Amino acid sequence: MVKKISRNGSSGKRESILRAATRVFARNGYFNSKVADIARAADVADGTVYLYFKSKEEILHSIFDQNMAEAITSGRKLIKALSDPREKLRRIARLHLERLGADRDLAVVFQVELRGSTKFMEEFSAAGFAEYLDLLCKIFEEGQRSRVFRKDLNAKVVSKILFGALDEMATNWIISHRNYKLEPMADVVMEVFLNGVSAE
């Protein structure tokens, strides 16, 4: 059982361990990484890591949970004052790629390491990922009610299509040998998503 630590002075060390783990997982791969590697990168003893996390798997979960929560909170704040559902989706799309583009190690963990097994995918799909898709879905449903978006489309499917497009942009950015900024790709995705590819 993990020892409970008071909040006073503990959050900084926990954050340091998570940042170190993100670097280690991105560079070595999750399955090739050890808690000792994370401790070394965080400049703490192995036992210190176990004061905050039960296992390497819990560390990976914590990286996901924390970053998804931050993305969802930031997204909701970003669109709070907006009324146009199209602009809301544009802002969320930019934020999605901006966050990943600002931290390549985090992007590698999200796009590659979290997908290393079916078990991980099932667990993470049931967690913050579902809440993120729900945010997209609710914006699209808002647009359907205001007749901005087509009413004959399934909002849940549409939200997955949008996420999938952004997700592929992030994955391609990671594996590409070209040096370019990721965030502007959100505008390309949204142009196609909102206006389609047919010439009319």
Regions found by a protein language model. Give the residues of each.
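Amphipathic C-terminal alpha-helical segment
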Residues: 98-102, 138, 142, 162-180, ...
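Short hydrophobic/aromatic patch on the recognition helix
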Residues: 43-53
